[in-house]
Amino acid sequence: SLMVRLAADPSTALRLMAEYPEPFSACEVGEIMAVLRRGMLPIAYEPLIGSPSRNLRIVGLNIVRQFGIEEAERLLLRIVSGDEDPELVREALYTLCALRRPLTRRAVSGRLSAMPPAERKALLRYVVAEGYSPGPLRRLLDERERPYYESL
């Protein structure tokens, strides 16, 4: 129903997304991104990322990732270093990877070390898929993870 309402009146998109009662699923975010790519929802990423609404922040991060907006790096690092929502932090880390930004910063390494092992392993697979060289990232990996990362 959200997508129907967005299509009917795109000018209410931000309000509708912010008021949506449940966290967006990956499918819902994908549908919103498809509408954005078609140019039907003219939305800027910065107000979304800075919004108090979790759903708007997730959409903002996806806009940055999909459109390769490197200028958002400062906002991404702010989320990584200080946000309390683990899902937003994870999405910001994946977005930094998608933009191929340096991951050896203190904020990033601190969050990586605090991640649960399964999430950290998934992120390492994504880092490899994005083409990061193992050399500079060695200091982010503990001894057990280095062989796994290098085997990918």
Which positions does each model-derived feature cover?
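Structural detector for internal amphipathic alpha-helices that build alpha-solenoid repeat scaffolds
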Residues: 1-8, 15-38, 46-50, 55-69, ...
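Alpha-helical repeat scaffolds
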Residues: 16-17, 45, 107-112, 137-145
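Helix-capping and short linker residues that terminate individual alpha-solenoid repeat units
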Residues: 84, 101-104, 116
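Core helices of alpha-solenoid repeat scaffolds
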Residues: 10, 38-42, 73, 105
